[in-house]
């Protein structure tokens, strides 16, 4: 529940509570807040237990689409495309078409790259003039 609140934010909340409520009422406010959170957690767990008892095995059938939606929410666009359009084959994105799921294809070795001599660029000769078209400008 408080996964996004760090220690710095907690310290600021405590200092703000100390300033607003004062040192006399702050322990009572903390106690009341913790009791309210505990009671809310008990209500939620009780509702979950009651749903499981009422629905029985059908409760798991209700949970499956929800967990699938949670998986989709956490996906990146690349992972979603890979999963749904390409059936998990990400060679389109990685460029490794000869490999299946990160492993080399059966009976295939490392590809041999041909060695080509380096090509040197020749500087343009100064005697040739650059073509100029007065109508183009």
UniProtKB/Swiss-Prot annotation:
Gene3D superfamilies: 1.20.5.3310
GO molecular function: protein transmembrane transporter activity
Alphabetically ordered keywords of this record: Cell membrane, Membrane, Protein transport, Translocation, Transmembrane, Transmembrane helix, Transport
Region (Disordered): 92-137
Disulfide bonds: none
GO BP of this protein: protein transport by the Tat complex
Signal peptide as annotated in the record: none
GO cellular component: TAT protein transport complex
Main location as per UniProt: membrane
Bilayer topology annotation: Single-pass membrane protein
Annotated transmembrane regions: 2-22
Domain of life where this protein originates: Bacteria
Alphabetized InterPro entries for the sequence: TatB
Family according to the record: Belongs to the TatB family.
Job description of the protein: Part of the twin-arginine translocation (Tat) system that transports large folded proteins containing a characteristic twin-arginine motif in their signal peptide across membranes. Together with TatC, TatB is part of a receptor directly interacting with Tat signal peptides. TatB may form an oligomeric binding site that transiently accommodates folded Tat precursor proteins before their translocation.
Quaternary structure annotation from Swiss-Prot or TrEMBL: The Tat system comprises two distinct complexes: a TatABC complex, containing multiple copies of TatA, TatB and TatC subunits, and a separate TatA complex, containing only TatA subunits. Substrates initially bind to the TatABC complex, which probably triggers association of the separate TatA complex to form the active translocon.
HAMAP family documented for this protein: TatB
Protein name per its UniProtKB record: Sec-independent protein translocase protein TatB
Organismal lineage: Bacteria, Bacillati, Actinomycetota, Actinomycetes, Mycobacteriales
Gene responsible for this protein: tatB
